[in-house]
């Protein structure tokens, strides 16, 4: 089994604390509201949102995937970090055992922030994972970030 790493940084005009609160802590409710074409629902199957929680995420009709199950590994409200593992779903296909994601939101000059995502794709057997296959996760994260950002800019009193 090989592990393939992929890292991406996406800038945002939203301050780090506000982005973490909306995109991460309340993302289960906010993202289906602002990007229903991407994600229609997030349901806690087990747990209360903290480490060990299992979530079932249903993708929108336009997606090539139907669902994933994720396990929350860590939530750090002080350092704005969140890590989770995709443990089930058609997104894993026959090549992947799991995908581990670590998100960190850091302050950027000028009052905005940077969303840093580090992903580890754990392949089954001798399967190779190429950059093109990993790029889908980056594109999805960026689309969701932009949808949340647009919402926050239009609703300046929320998530402060």
Curated annotation (Swiss-Prot):
Gene3D superfamilies: 3.30.530.20. Changing residue 11 to T: In clone COR A 1/11. PROSITE patterns: PATHOGENESIS_BETVI. One of its GO terms (biological process) is defense response. Pfam families: Bet_v_1. GO terms for molecular function: abscisic acid binding; protein phosphatase inhibitor activity; signaling receptor activity. Changing residue 114 to T: In clone COR A 1/16. Keywords: Allergen, Pathogenesis-related protein, Plant defense. GO terms for cellular component: cytoplasm; nucleus. Changing residue 134 to I: In clone COR A 1/11. PANTHER family: OS08G0374000 PROTEIN-RELATED, STRESS-INDUCED PROTEIN SAM22. The sequence shown is that of clone Cor a I/5. Belongs to the BetVI family. This is Major pollen allergen Cor a 1 isoforms 5, 6, 11 and 16. It comes from Corylus avellana.
């Amino acid at each position: 089994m090989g592990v393939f790493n992929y890292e991406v940084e996406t800038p945002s005009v939203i301050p780090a604390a506000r982005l973490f609160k909306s995109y991460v802590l309340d993302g289960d409710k906010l993202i289906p509201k602002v990007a229903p074409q991407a994600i229609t629902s997030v349901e806690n199957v087990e747990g209360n949102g903290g480490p060990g929680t299992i979530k079932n995420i249903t993708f929108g009709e336009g997606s090539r995937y139907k669902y994933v199950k994720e396990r929350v590994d860590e939530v750090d409200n002080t350092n704005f970090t969140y890590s989770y593992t995709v443990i089930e779903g058609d997104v894993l296909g026959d090549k992947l055992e799991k995908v581990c994601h670590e998100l960190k939101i850091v302050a950027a000059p000028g009052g905005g922030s940077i969303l840093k995502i580090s992903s580890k794709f754990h392949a089954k057997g001798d399967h190779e994972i190429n950059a093109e296959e990993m790029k889908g996760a980056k594109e999805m994260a960026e689309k969701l970030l932009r949808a949340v950002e647009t919402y926050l800019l239009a609703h300046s009193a929320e998530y402060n």
